[in-house]
Amino acid sequence: MKQTPLNARHRALGARMVEFGGWDMPVQYAGIIAEHKATREGAGLFDISHMARFWVTGPDSERFIQLIDTFDISKTAIGQSDYGIMCYEDGGIVDDIFTYHLGPDEWMVVANAGNAEKDWAWLNQHTAGYDVVLTDRSQELAMIALQGPKAESLLAPLTDADVVNLAFHGITKATVEGAAGYISRTGYTGEDGFELFLPAGEIERIWDRLLEVGATPIGLGARDSLRFEPGLALYGHEIERDINPYEAKLGWVVKLDKGPFIGSEALHDIKANGPVRTLVGLEMTGRGIARQGYPVVALDGSELGVVTTGMPSPSLGKNLAYALVKAGSLKIGAEVDVLIREKPVRATVVKTPFYKARYKK
């Protein structure tokens, strides 16, 4: 298994370690609920060095990203970033990505850990005819996230960057406690916060300092519940090879009017005809937790779809789930059954997202 530069720190903190996307990662320290609440109420510190960091440089860098990304990054100014999706020709999802505009002809693409090799190959497959250089800097630069309402006040004294006035989705060159890299106002929790891209050799020291000033270490368990409540998609759950952005309620990142890109023809047809499936929120009213893969059926037993993610919500105190179901089959307030070990357990369709994100915009 691969290890991040913070592996020894996680073990010293008593983290429970698990395999995730080929990496040895902390799933929890004090406990998932405590870590979840620490992030919602204070500042959570996450090791996300397992994610991929690819540089795209050269005269055709913007044109190349326009080819592989559903979003229109021609409007992404230097010092800004945007969320987007890479699609196959049929509209299925390769991965969701963040693209950061670092400078003239210089971009960083951040992709999911479990998809890193596939994404790297995908990018390299499509460079023909484009004057670009792709560089994988995932080993060289570590990546940590500081998230929550107290993130700004903890980080500001430790950096020369003006993080107080850094825009939502903004990115800036920064020095943190003497380590030079980048800070972005991005995250995966539904809270205000930052992601730090710093030299791997310096990251243990920065991690220790952030804990010293009051951040709480957070594992992958709480990272999942924190992203789940505000409805942030996770590859392998809400998005996947056989799911398209419109089904995943991510049509807002598909900019068909920007010109051709990989998958644009198929996505144009899907939008015109309407998606076959759609993502809905469920609140369990019967006793039980809906887990990924559990069937969702109508009260007469007919198949509707499948749960993508389900868990008890630490913020709301309810058992909630997202499910991919036949489009048009369910309205808010409708009752369905989730088959938990083949036993029907009642659930109600509810509005999403479950939790309103509290970004600083």
Curated annotation (Swiss-Prot):
Gene3D superfamilies: Aminomethyltransferase beta-barrel domains, Aminomethyltransferase fragment, Probable tRNA modification gtpase trme, domain 1. One of its GO terms (molecular function) is transaminase activity. Keywords: Aminotransferase, Transferase. The keyword Ribosomal protein does not apply. InterPro entries: GCS_T, GCS_T_bac, GCST_C, GCV_T_N, GcvT/YgfZ/DmdA, GcvT/YgfZ_C, TrmE/GcvT_dom1. Its EC number is 2.1.2.10. It comes from the Bacteria. GO terms for biological process: glycine decarboxylation via glycine cleavage system. It catalyses: N(6)-[(R)-S(8)-aminomethyldihydrolipoyl]-L-lysyl-[protein] + (6S)-5,6,7,8-tetrahydrofolate = N(6)-[(R)-dihydrolipoyl]-L-lysyl-[protein] + (6R)-5,10-methylene-5,6,7,8-tetrahydrofolate + NH4(+). The keyword Nucleus does not apply. Pfam families: GCV_T (PF01571), GCV_T_C (PF08669). GO terms for cellular component: cytosol; glycine cleavage complex. Belongs to the GcvT family. The glycine cleavage system catalyzes the degradation of glycine. HAMAP family: GcvT (MF_00259). The glycine cleavage system is composed of four proteins: P, T, L and H. PANTHER family: AMINOMETHYLTRANSFERASE, AMINOMETHYLTRANSFERASE, MITOCHONDRIAL. This is Aminomethyltransferase.
